[in-house]
Amino acid sequence: MMDRRRLIALFGGATAAWPLQLRAQQPGRTYRIGALALLPRDSPAYVALFDGLRRQGFVERQNLTIDPRGFGLHVEQFSDVAAQLVKAQVEVILPVGDAAIRAAQQATATIPILAIADDMLGAGLITSLAHPGGTTTGISILATELDGKRQQLLIELIPGVRRIAALVDSNTKAAGQLEALGDAARARGIELSLHRVAEPDEIVGAIDAAQAAGASGLNVLSSPLLGSQRQLIIERAAVLRLPAIYQWPEAAEEGGLAGYGPRLVQVWRDEMARQLVKLLQGVKPADLPVQQPTKFELVLNLKTARTMGLTIPEAMLDRAEKVIE
């Protein structure tokens, strides 16, 4: 691999690493948190989060209890598990995605909610970024804007492309967002087909349908569902030799053709952990601004490109922060 540029800190003012020390904790107290997500407990996101908490002095089985029931869920389980977490008196609930956030908000009006989602303000989950109000704060990852940017990059990655597809989580994407992608594609003379999924077992069929529709490239739109099934998508795209671009740069390091966005590990290890620690220390969520990523990375995988018979334009290679040979 070669780094084309030095990766800058992901969030303005966020610290990349902290000393291993306790910070404003009550001696002898154990803190209890609970997730509400499609992601499994061993996903890179949670591994990064727990590492960030450890760096801040919050260590599982020492002074931190992580309720096990909220990992690896299906959407229809969110409401029941949210109610269980409230009954268990967790001190913070950590939902991922709009549906999980709404379930947590409906379950409690008092327990702090630290969330990560595509567009928390646009979805009506908070009242403002600077002053979110209520019990919910967290990270809004600019998904709508980044989905459009990834579509643009995908078109530039495939010389002469005339037709592309988008893999869509039907639980999260609004019609207006998808219309904007279609308008942007048509403005460049590109035909865009949409392939919706609501459950993991629909993903392979949707990717197959995209290729059958004549798509020469696939834009994997941001969503908790598609993020949790990233390896499945990478593997299916490889079998079909279908170039695809993903929400997180790490996807290209795992065998995908391209990834563009903020670093998943840094979002969770640095910013999510920092905000969670503040909530555990007693800061009110209404007073904790919702954060947005400010630094993004393009990673390209030349090995994957070669297996797909794709020659990436030199101009694209020059733009990438990292190229995997």
Spans of features found by a protein language model:
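Short hydrophobic alpha-helices and adjacent helix-cap/hinge residues
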Residues: 1-325
